[in-house]
Amino acid sequence: TIDIDALRKLAHEIKPAMITVGGSLNLFHHPIADVRAIADEVGAKVLFDAAHLCGMIAGKVWPQPLVEGAHLMTFSTYKSLGGPAGGLIVTNDDAIAQKLDAIAYPGLTANFDAAKTAALGVTLQDWKAVGPAYAQMMVKTSQALAQNLQNRGVNIYAADKGFTTSHQFAILAAPYGGGQTAARRMAEAGLLACGIGLPIAAVEGDLNGLRIGTPEIVRLGMKVEHMDQLADFIARSLDATVDSLSVKSEVTQWRKQFSGVHYTVDLPN
């Protein structure tokens, strides 16, 4: 979360032109209105980095930062949005939009990728039709997977707050030698995750958290009822006494039932 009092003090000290809100792990809603109030006090703009939350916002399971007071929002068009690699800058401020338009092309960019633009158009068509259902399932599976892991003795960050309200959560990685070490063990078992820093005691030589997200597994068709089995695989992959390759063979076989791409719409020929 954000320490609003500390932010106000710092903002008045350095008088920034812009205050950026966002991060690589977003578990709970950000106090955008409070940040905007501070920005107004010092004449700053507010930029919300929605790189990881783009799908949550598009699916209306996360507050819309531009409505809450952000002047600008940047986001990836892949990650939780599930589109082609790239990003967008959006605003509901006409003056800012005109300035962005004046410098973006030609200027900061010399051309655009027509194929990527077409792919993004298809992605956004999907979101208009089934985006809310996709986003809701990402959150539900994230919460269910976190709970199932906690039940198996794999401690989750922010357990006292319900783990998460997004598609992401974090495992406390110290018992596994750190987040990157844990991620490598999971990779040996055919499971992908990554280390991440958490605002808790450090792990020397490694990260103290292990980040897990659900956009890909939901797109493949996994639902809440599949999270118990997935938690079992993850818990065993993190157990140093368990053979990772034996877990991988089970994961590979289990994964075969999820072969389609879900939350899409058929476009006319």
Report each predicted region and the residues it spans.
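Short acidic (Asp/Glu) and glycine-rich catalytic loops that position anionic groups and cofactors
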Residues: 16, 97-102, 119-126, 160-168, ...
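Active-site lining segments that contact anionic ligands and/or coordinate catalytic metals
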Residues: 70, 84-86, 164-168, 183, ...
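Intrinsically disordered or highly flexible coil/loop and linker segments, enriched in small
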Residues: 109, 113, 133, 151-155, ...
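Conserved PLP-enzyme active-site core in the AAT-like
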Residues: 1-155, 214
